[in-house]
Amino acid sequence: MITCIIRYHIDLNQKAEFEQYARNWGQAIPRCGADLVGYFAPYEGSATLAYGVYSVESLAAYEQYRSRLAADPLGRENYEFAKRNRFVLREDRTFLKLASSPHPALVSP
C-alpha cells in the first residue's frame, strides 16, 4: 500500500472554491478506486497550504486509478473547475509507505 500526499498552494482569496474542489474529489476519488483519507483546507497557521491524502495498492494501481479519474465525468469537471478558477497555484505529489506499522489504536486518557 502506498499513500499519495498532495500538497496544494492555493489562492487565499479562493478558499471556498478549493473546498468545493475537495468535496467533488470526495465523491470521485473513491468511485475511481483510491482509498481517500480526505482533503484538508487551511484552518490555523498558513492560509495557503492545503492537502489531499489517499492510498492505493501500488504504482500500477495508481496509474489505473488516474485513468479512471480522467474518464470520470465529475473528475473531468473538477479538473476544468480548477483550471478555470485558478485557485490552485501549485500542486506537488509525494508517494509514501507506512513505516510505523503495526501500531496501537488511539488510547484515550
Give the label of every model feature segment:
Residues 16, 60-62, 101:
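Residue-level signal for secondary-structure boundary sites
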Residues 9-20:
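Short, surface-exposed ligand-recognition loops at beta-strand->loop->(often short) alpha-helix junctions
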Residues 20-37, 56-94:
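An amphipathic, aromatic/His-enriched active-site/gating alpha helix that lines ligand/cofactor pockets
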Residues 2-9, 38-70, 93-94, 107-109:
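Short, well-ordered beta-strand segments in beta-rich or mixed alpha/beta enzyme
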Residues 86, 90-91, 96-109:
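Acidic/histidine-enriched, glycine/proline-rich intrinsically disordered or flexible terminal extensions
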